[in-house]
Amino acid sequence: AQVADVDPARTVRENILDGVRPVLELIGRFERLPPHSPEAAALEARIAALDGWTIDTRLNELVTSLSAPSLSLPAANLSGGELRRVALCRTLIGQPDMVLLDEPTNHLDTEAISWLETYISRGRGTFVCVTHDRAFLDAISDRVLELSHGGLYSFEGGYVEYLRGKADREATAEQQELRRQRFIRREIDWIRRGP
């Protein structure tokens, strides 16, 4: 579904930071520790491993790059496109290993689309995108999957390579079907002639 799962009772900032809530909880725990606590070094290393010390930088980059609304606005006042951008920021701020994006370029301007292409192409994690935006698909893809007639077909490369591979697959299937029909005609002729 292309519905943004954003809490209308919270601000843009709070909704986006939900994407890193576990890391923020670790930071809060770290900040409450007494100085020179034996737990501090291990907790600090864990936060660093999760890239927790860069959350504010990532937040500002995402909001700016994806043209998200002001961080202080309540989500209840946002348009559908703004809600989708907030949800996209929330997803990306957590730097997940795998992301499923449904029509990610909807409601993005050309600068935001260009930034998203670069972000995805940097290669941190796996991105599975469902999109009709062929230029975006060609820019970000190293593999295209097609679901067709009950089959799943995989094509190495972007959209252009997909079109070539699909044309080759369809031409091969057409040749196989012609051979099958010729064989059936020969069998029917043989049956009609009798043994």
Locations of regions flagged by a protein language model:
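ABC ATP-binding cassette signature C-motif
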Residues: A1-L178, I191
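Short cytosolic helices in intracellular loops of multi-pass membrane proteins
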Residues: L178-G194
